[in-house]
Swiss-Prot record:
Domain of life: Eukaryota
GO BP of this protein: positive regulation of transcription by RNA polymerase II
Span list, region Disordered: 1-28, 64-141, 489-522, 536-573
Traits of the deletion mutant: Abolishes the production of acurin A.
This protein's record includes keyword Metal-binding: yes
UniProt biased composition (Basic and acidic residues): 88-99
Name of the featured protein: Acurin A biosynthesis cluster transcription regulator
Taxon lineage: Eukaryota, Fungi, Dikarya, Ascomycota, Pezizomycotina
Annotated TM spans: none
Gene: acrR
Keywords on record: DNA-binding, Metal-binding, Nucleus, Transcription, Transcription regulation, Zinc
Function: Transcription factor that positively regulates the expression of the cluster that mediates the biosynthesis of acurin A, a highly reduced polyketide coupled to a serine via a peptide bond.
GO MF term set: DNA-binding transcription factor activity, RNA polymerase II-specific; sequence-specific DNA binding; zinc ion binding
Length: 631
């Protein structure tokens, strides 16, 4: 008999642990053999010896201690259970569908019924050699049983799994999700049919995208323009140094828009929480929203960082898809693009621009870069992502500026010109309600509470700068590098073509509505179109915000604020009819449904962009006037 056989025979059998009594586990090797990492052998032919050979030779006690690590018990020497149905039956209540299990039916009963049904049409061996029989091995199944298995599974799936939800119930769930989520406001624009085509003589979107020529770069030479290196956007985004395609930019913008949307959700949650806390308080007149200064700074920095990344993407798009060279450059004024919508966005982001001279002549067309197709819907998505990202940034900055406006209004309660009966309940300056917004210029920072309005003004100027650059870069991407906005072509209206005159006069700058003079230096600013006009009329002191958006009208004079506050909910705009100058024509060709749908969404997004820019401009002018007057 070999030592291994004698070891197996002489090893004391451990009793099987039961739920009632669990035996203490011991090592199979004694302590001395375990410490020496040697095999623990019993004397051959002796079955009652509890000491191993080494302990007998050393004349020491053979001690077996419990194992220090309790692992999974070995299954080789233990007999397998004869059947497993009790374990399966114990788990059946957890997986039984309550809507399908009638009259006490279970999964096992359904399988038995399906097998009985299959036995009537299949070979007799298929029932005995079912793939779900535990006693049979998968290798021993016959071909008939293998062929029968899919039928059994299909029968089970058709009889057990629940049917899809009804269409009405699904619609209710989608509506509930849409109402609770803080997604893009243009999400509900999809599905609206029959967008009207723009006329051939109209510049697409020119009456909605009003603003300056791109301020990003100063181009001195055509050859240097093609040598602008592509730099990485962010470590989390595309970081390759090679030339990017439209797909790469779409991926960058999708990731960037997800970050901006997350900022929007957190900002909206912070405002709702502050409004709830303010509603539970005494509601004293002049009390600001209890938003900590640290949270405000965090959200401001996040959105400024997202704006920087947006500018980076637009810079790379405009640098890569810009025309490399042209024999002649057309005049810097409005021009007409191909109105066919399946070519619109491809023309905007590629080199294939058509410059209108005198309304009839066409300028020189540059060659389309490799890999750019005029009918590629990827360019429609690219334009859509750029505009909706800019729209969400407008939402976020509008909320941040409204917080600044709210704090300045509450700071006005400490002004000596304010009536005493309105400020008698106002305590001293509180850092939690009127904190100093630590704005620093190099090594200099403001430390006086009297400079609070100036600090807020610097924040507004910084937001204005980044949004203006994003808008001008977006115009450069959509309408070409030589696009001159209608607001800046009023001086040459007499010499421009009919189409140019129409596009220049379609939508006047907001300054004309209030009587302020149009200043050339501020024509490109989103916020301050007539910031240098100091003749404040009664209409300049009260800026009414667009109705239905939750904005409270604000009075520059020191009067008690209205009871309603900035809720910053983003309701979907009602049916917005775009200007007739854009949608007043019918094109001869019908665009693809996908591109036509994107065009309709973009038009509605542009209308909401214009509304938000007006709200931001009114708030910024209020803060600017406070900064100039002081308090």
């Amino acid at each position: 008999m070999s030592p291994n056989m004698s070891l197996t025979a002489s090893h004391p059998q451990q009793p099987q642990p039961t739920p009632q009594s669990k035996a203490q586990l011991t090592r199979q090797a004694c302590n001395r053999c375990h410490a020496s990492k040697l095999k623990c052998l019993r004397p051959p032919g002796v079955t009652t010896s509890k000491s191993c050979i080494r302990c007998i030779k050393a004349d020491t006690e053979c001690v077996y201690d419990p194992p220090q690590r309790f692992g999974r018990p070995r299954q080789k020497s233990r007999p397998q259970p004869e059947s497993v149905p009790p374990r399966i039956e114990a788990r059946e209540p957890e997986v039984t569908d309550p809507r399908r299990a009638r009259h006490g039916s279970t999964i096992g009963a359904r399988w038995e019924s399906s097998e009985r049904e299959s036995n009537g049409s299949l070979a007799p061996s298929s029932a005995a050699e079912s793939p779900y029989t535990a006693a049979e091995s998968p290798d021993n199944r016959s071909s008939a049983a293998v062929a029968a298995a899919p039928l059994v599974g299909m029968d089970y799936a058709s009889s057990h799994f629940p049917e899809p939800l009804e269409s009405e119930r699904t619609s209710e769930l989608l509506d509930a999700f849409q109402s609770e989520s803080m997604q893009l406001d243009v999400d509900s624009y999809w599905g609206e049919t029959d967008p009207v085509m723009p006329p051939a003589a109209t510049v697409p979107y020119s009456d909605l995208l009003t603003g300056p020529i791109d301020l990003d770069f100063t181009v001195s030479d055509q050859d240097d323009r093609a040598k602008i290196p592509k730099h990485a956007l962010d470590p989390a985004l595309s970081g390759a140094d090679t030339g990017s395609t439209a797909d790469d930019y779409v991926l960058d913008l999708v990731q960037l828009q997800a970050s901006v949307n997350q900022n929007n959700r957190e900002l909206a949650a912070m405002i709702r929480k502050a409004q709830s806390a303010l509603g539970m308080s005494d509601g004293r007149v002049g009390q600001a929203l209890p938003i900590p200064d640290s949270q405000f700074k965090t959200h401001l920095q996040r959105n400024l960082k997202a704006s920087e990344q947006t500018l980076d993407v637009l810079h790379r798009i405009n640098s890569q898809f810009a025309p490399v060279s042209r024999e002649t450059r057309p005049p810097s004024r409005s021009y007409g693009l191909d109105p066919t919508l399946d070519r619109l966005y491809a023309d905007c982001v590629s080199q294939d621009h058509a410059f209108g001279v005198g309304g009839d002549e066409l300028g020189v067309r540059a060659t389309t870069p490799p890999g750019v197709s005029a009918a590629d819907p990827q360019h429609s998505i690219l334009a859509f992502l750029v505009l909706t990202t800019y729209l969400r940034l407008l939402h976020n900055f509008d909320a941040l500026i409204s917080i600044l406006q709210d704090r300045l209004r509450c700071s006005a309660s400490l002004d000596p010109r304010r009536p005493l009966h309105l400020s008698e309940d106002i305590s001293a300056s509180d850092s939690s309600s009127n904190p100093l917004l630590d704005v620093s210029l190099g090594s200099f920072s403001f430390s006086s509470s009297s400079a609070r309005s100036l600090q807020a003004m610097l924040n507004v100027q910084m937001i204005n700068t980044v949004l203006t650059k994003i808008k001008s870069s977006t115009q450069r991407m959509l309408l070409g590098p030589d696009y001159l906005p209608p607001s800046s072509c009023s001086s040459s209206a007499s010499t421009s073509s009919t189409a140019s005159t129409t596009s220049c006069s379609t939508r006047a700058p907001p300054s004309s509505a209030t009587g302020g003079a149009h200043h050339p230096a501020t024509a490109g600013s989103i916020f301050f179109h007539h910031a240098h006009s100091h003749s404040h009329s009664s209409s300049d002191h009260l800026f009414s915000q667009p109705e239905g958006r939750g904005y409270a009208p604000y009075n520059h004079a020191f009067h008690p604020p209205p009871p309603s506050r900035h809720t910053h909910n983003y309701p979907t705009p009602e049916t917005i009819t775009p200007p007739s100058s854009v949608l007043g024509g019918v094109s001869g060709t019908t665009p693809p449904p996908f591109v036509s749908g994107v065009d309709h969404v973009v038009r509605r997004a542009l209308t909401e962009v214009q509304e938000l820019e007006l709200s931001l401009r009114n708030r910024a002018r209020a803060i600017q006037q406070w900064s100039e007057e002081g308090f």
